[in-house]
């Protein structure tokens, strides 16, 4: 009597190919998962590291170009309309142009000679700190409002949570230095555009103070709200006649 043949004895029986195909499918899925994992790791590395490298290089280029423009007579730059600000005149910047440098001693590892550009569009925020074009210029009555990334793309305001009431923010323009003192902060909705009004929270009010507003995303990796800091102008220096602010001199 002939013994029964099992799939373990004869690979030609129907059960064997099904098992082989199943293991092949598992292998393909495993390779796909590994590939996806590698791609995700590369994307994370790009976001967390490489975008900062690119942004830092772009910011350095903006600083070099801005300081070069300051070394030439204003009439040779072809800049926009001049407006009276603080100790002298500033040229109203063109959209996308860098026009100031910002220094925050508390955040000196990130914001020390950081360029301020006339734009809050994403490509420009990857080159420095952005100035809301509809708000006032440094030293002007009203609200000099700026925005910056807190995560990736240079992340100038990464450590906004370290800021404290009384901290100083310095803004350098062609002919002047401005010192602002931080007064208060608040977490708001992304739709709360009133935070950059000339008089925040008082629509239509005529400004009498010279304010600064720092805006950034919150929480750092979720960006569901906005972290706002307001400050007031506390001092000005004319580059032609005054010495450097002590905090700037100490930091150099």
Name each region found by the language model:
Residues 21, 27-28, 38-252:
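Solvent-exposed, non-transmembrane regions of membrane-associated and secreted proteins
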Residues 1-26:
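Terminal targeting segments of Actinobacterial cell-envelope proteins
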